[in-house]
A protein has these predicted regions:
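Short, glycine-rich nucleotide/cofactor-binding loops
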Residues: 64-72
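Short glycine/serine/threonine-rich phosphate/pyrophosphate-binding segments
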Residues: 71-76, 150
Length: 336
């Protein structure tokens, strides 16, 4: 199989499910250019009015925000309160069964205290988490399929339970990662009584902007703590909540030839933070690496051995694009 990469950002082409490219340029890069044609100020004014017009007088909360200890959650809440007149959002945090990072704990605590907000920590049934995660890992190498559905579902369920008409989520993944050419405002699960809004379709999403906004209110990165010196990563400020969760992202490398390093490095190219060559070197050096602490935490949480983990990885390895190196690590054929 010929391995192709985007002419603009260097991302591997043709392996991400549902992704598209045109003339050797990934749709994520093309969508970056499409953002210039969106009237963001108009969308922001629309949102302020939409929130005002759709308040439930019988509810103490104007909206629900699905949150974590990450930068995007801080930015969404900050802008809702400071730019859109929201007084009292209800924050909903869905937990997994992995070990939380000190940074994630600190950031979520800081977010709640900064604006004096209500927070619901939703712990999904732990035995079901283990059962479903094991099943999806062994059968599909898609370990967190079940809990990721909960991360989207629980804020909506909470909103419906309390009669709250609006739910906010972060970026529009289909647009940002090159599956759709349209920057839709509403999530497909929106209905007549509850609207789910992608905040990244109201304010143009970028890692740099989100980080700057979050740091202005005290956001802390993994490097501010000593509990997790993460490997196989392009940064210390994205996906920082829990350690074992990173395996969900890393397994994409085994199936599709990319993981979080490619996603972040190529996004940095689109944002002007890195050159294509710098991103390519970062991908070559780090995209294949499975963080050892994440692997250990994942195996502990779902009660499997590291040998079982390795055997399952080998079973699903995409040998069209990957080959094992001399040390037994799966690597992209074009980068070894």
């Amino acid at each position: 199989m010929e391995i192709r990469t985007c002419k603009k950002c260097g991302f591997i082409l043709g392996t991400r499910p549902n992704s598209k490219d045109v003339g050797g340029v990934c749709l994520a890069c093309l969508n970056k250019d499409r953002k210039h044609g969106i009237n963001w100020e108009e969308r922001q004014k629309w949102l302020t009015q939409f929130i005002q017009d759709n308040k439930n007088a019988d509810s103490k909360w104007e909206c629900v925000v699905g949150v974590s200890g990450g930068k995007d959650s801080c930015t969404i809440v900050k802008r809702l309160i400071e730019h859109h007149g929201v007084k009292n959002p209800l924050l909903v945090h869905v937990c997994d069964e992995f070990t939380p990072s000190e940074a994630g704990i600190a950031n979520l605590d800081n977010l709640v205290k900064t604006y004096d907000l209500d927070l619901l920590n939703f712990r999904c049934a732990p035995q079901t988490f283990v059962k479903e995660t094991r099943k999806s890992f062994f059968e599909k190498l898609h370990p967190l399929e079940w809990v990721e559905k909960q991360i989207y579902a629980k804020p909506l369920e909470t909103a419906k339970a309390f009669g709250i008409p609006i739910v906010f989520m972060g970026e529009n993944p289909a647009f940002e990662y090159g599956e759709s050419e349209t920057c839709e405002i509403f999530h497909p699960a929106s209905d007549g009584s509850t609207k789910i809004i992608y905040f990244g379709s109201i304010w143009p999403y970028s890692n740099a902007d989100s980080l700057a906004q979050a740091q202005s209110m005290g956001f802390r990165t993994l490097s501010d703590f000593d509990d997790w010196q993460r490997q196989g990563s392009a940064d210390d400020f994205t996906q920082i909540d829990s350690k074992g969760y990173m395996i969900q992202l890393w397994t994409k490398f085994i199936k599709f030839g990319f993981q979080r390093v490619s996603d972040v490095a190529c996004r940095f190219v689109r944002e002007g933070v890195l050159t294509k060559e710098q991103a390519g070197q970062m991908i070559k050096d780090s995209d294949w690496i499975c963080d050892p602490l994440a692997k250990k935490d994942f195996c502990r949480a779902i009660k499997i051995t590291e040998k079982e983990f390795d055997e399952t990885i080998d079973k699903f390895a995409n040998t069209d694009i990957l080959v094992k190196d001399a040390n037994g690590h799966w690597r992209r054929k074009d980068l070894i």
